[in-house]
């Protein structure tokens, strides 16, 4: 008996694998209701056998499970002892848990590469765009796995605050909504190697819909500063990435643009 890579098969073992969404993190909705991953309701598991020079190769098909209580459990995952594997997780929000394979904000059809969904207009300050991932090695698999694997965000969170909102005396002139435009942010990520999908030359970047300013979020650093937006942006792990080409336009509650110079 051989595996799909022409390798002699080891002992077939069925295991249960759990993944947990890391709770806590930056405030995203309001001071009283911080971003804690509670909008995450789907988790995908891809198993990859490490095949020497060919690198990680898909082993079996992708598994989908609903996230409940910030945890997803994958039962009856079958592996062969004696081989090296990578377990690749992606957890995000879907519109309905009755069909977990239907993507929402992020496209996973080329998993383990995940990209923005071009069919969904980008929107700032949207906690359903939160997501988590993790890549874990099983070397010389002996039949044992961790009790649970903790996932982390693949993003840097861009938070924009204003320090002079209170200087606007008329409430009618104070912005209630903003629109963000980005010309150079990554549009996706290879979850296994961490490489980012760069925007195509001349693609025009990412232009968001008009989105409401988060409710009553103040800066933890500058007293009196008010948050205007937050955005989840794919970022390299443990490295800095400069972001250029950011524009913010300002609107009232009725989506009419205000006479405020774009930022």
Model regions and ranges:
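Bacterial Sec-dependent N-terminal signal peptides
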Residues: 1-20, 160
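Intrinsic-disorder/low-complexity, polar/charged segments enriched in Ser/Thr/Lys/Arg/Asp/Glu/Gln
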Residues: 12-16, 71-73, 144-146, 157, ...
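Beta-strand secondary-structure signal
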Residues: 14-18, 44, 86-88, 146-148, ...
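Short solvent-exposed capping/turn motifs at the termini of beta-strands
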Residues: 21-23, 164
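Tryptophan-paired
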Residues: 32-102, 167-263
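Structured interaction patches on ligand/partner-binding surfaces of diverse proteins
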Residues: 65-67, 95-146, 216-218, 255-263
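A short mid-domain helix/strand-loop element embedded in enzyme catalytic domains
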Residues: 141-142, 150-152, 179-183
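Surface-exposed interaction/gating patches
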Residues: 152-169
